[in-house]
A protein has these predicted regions:
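Conserved catalytic cores of soluble enzyme domains
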Residues: 54-174
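Extended active-site and interfacial segments that coordinate phosphate-rich ligands
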Residues: 21, 29-43, 103, 107-108, ...
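A generic local secondary-structure boundary/capping motif
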Residues: 4-6, 39-42, 75-79, 99-100, ...
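A structural preference for short, pocket-lining loop segments at secondary-structure junctions
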Residues: 6-20, 35-61, 221-234, 248-257
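Short acidic loop-to-helix transition motifs that present clustered carboxylates
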Residues: 35, 93-97, 214
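Short coil/turn segments at secondary-structure boundaries
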Residues: 23-31, 62-69
């Protein structure tokens, strides 16, 4: 039901946790949770990032409370790992139930056009509300655009692999010596200065969480060979206004940085 292992992307090492949806629709069991927790412990011990490939309809009914105990263990281990090494969550299909919380703990969450994420499945929500609820209404990247959970929306696994490689290249590569006092004449041209122009001045800039509060752009990048996090406000013709949404986005990004 769940496969754990070790792999490399561009020679960078990663621990992998992958759910097999073909086994009981990815149903979570206590044994699977113990296996995932063991993989997370190994990642912490070896200071190696983790990639979670998630695809689950929830816990196995026959497991009862023991499965919930296992999930609590996994979420606790992942929370303890936060800030130690990067964690990447890939919503590789439909993910419902408490395991969806793992995407909120991870540093980066990847969606595709076939990704759906929700703590309560559409069937559960429909039963509680008495309304016809479709998974497109509650679990897509667009439906979750204000939550800050969707770091990237991609076309498929190959693009996800490339994004993970780009991020790892930024945060893991050794610091390079460079002149930090270089003049940037383009900054004096206020009429043409926008988020895209500023991003072009950064090295290897990768925009994170573009769907949430789009007037506040957040980038991982390098400046003078040093890994950096950049926040650029761009309200278009009008100045961007600070509000709860974009401030929450900036705060979470700053905490990761």
């Amino acid at each position: 039901g769940v496969i754990t292992g070790f792999a490399t992307i561009l020679d960078y090492p990663f621990y992998i946790v992958a759910q097999n949806f073909k086994v009981l629709c990815g149903g979570i069991s206590k044994a699977q949770c113990d296996k995932i927790a063991k993989c997370i412990d190994a990642a912490e011990k070896n200071a190696t990032p983790v990639i979670y490939l998630l695809n689950s309809q929830g816990v196995q009914l026959g497991e009862g409370v023991t499965a919930l105990e296992g999930l609590a263990k996994v979420l606790m281990r992942a929370t303890q790992l936060k800030g130690v090494v990067p964690q990447y969550a890939v919503v590789n299909g439909e993910v419902y139930g408490s395991l969806a919380t793992l995407c909120a703990i991870a540093d980066f969450t990847f969606f595709t056009k076939k990704s759906y994420l929700a703590v309560n499945s559409p069937l559960v929500i429909a039963a509680k509300t008495g309304k016809d609820v479709k998974k497109e209404d509650v679990g897509t990247a667009q439906a979750l655009d204000k939550t800050g959970l969707v770091s990237f929306v991609t076309e498929g696994m190959e693009e996800i692999r490339e994004k993970i490689a780009e991020i790892t290249e930024i945060v893991s590569s050794p610091m390079l010596d460079a002149e930090l006092n270089d003049a940037v004449p383009a900054l004096n041209n206020a009429d043409k200065l926008n988020a895209a122009a500023i991003a072009g001045m950064l090295e290897n800039a990768v925009e994170v969480n573009a769907l949430c509060a789009p007037e506040a752009k957040t980038y991982l990048c390098r400046i003078g060979g040093i890994a950096a996090a950049a926040v650029v406000f761009d309200g278009g013709e009008n100045a961007a206004e600070l509000n709860a949404g974009n401030l929450a986005k900036v705060r979470e990004f700053a905490e990761f940085a």
